[in-house]
Amino acid sequence: MNLDIKGQLVWEDSIEIFNQLEEIEKEYKSILDANSRVVYENDMIEVEPLNVTILSNGGVSWILNAVYDKLMDIKSMGIEIITHAYGVCASAGLCLFLAGDKRYAGEGTVFMYHAEQYANIQDDINNVIEFAQFVKENDRFEKIFIENTNVTKEMLDEHKGRDWYFGYDLAMKIGLLTPIEVEEEKEYIITESECIKVMR
């Protein structure tokens, strides 16, 4: 199954993404339910991974949380998630990318770990509550990033308060991307007598 996350995660587009994820979740539940009643393994329906393509410069954190949590619901069913990043994978897009069990990207992809921004627009009591939520969300993203890469908290602290842009090579180095396995060429050595047998 496939899901495309393209553009900024804003209300209108993100509702469509969330609705698609709910439909995908229902379809997986249906397949898993059918497979649980199968007597012979040959009759089982193949459970394909969920391929998520991401081309996003970020978005609103509460939309990120909704989509990320729904991806985790699907993953908790035993479904493999494979994320693919192209072009730009920034902020909320990067967090969603980290949901992948396997993570791949185009070589020209630019990644960005975001120094989240807090807008102070309400009265003082609301500001305290909103800021506490902001800190909680920021801590969650930091935890997700650290758990799914080779990056330490100390390394992230070096970039605190500013956006951290990096490319494919550094993404591979820090464990953000799944290394692509290349099959080794096999060398076949045959004796002269085996060669003569083959030629006959």
What residue ranges belong to the model's regions?
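N-terminal organellar transit peptides
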Residues: 1-92, 98-200
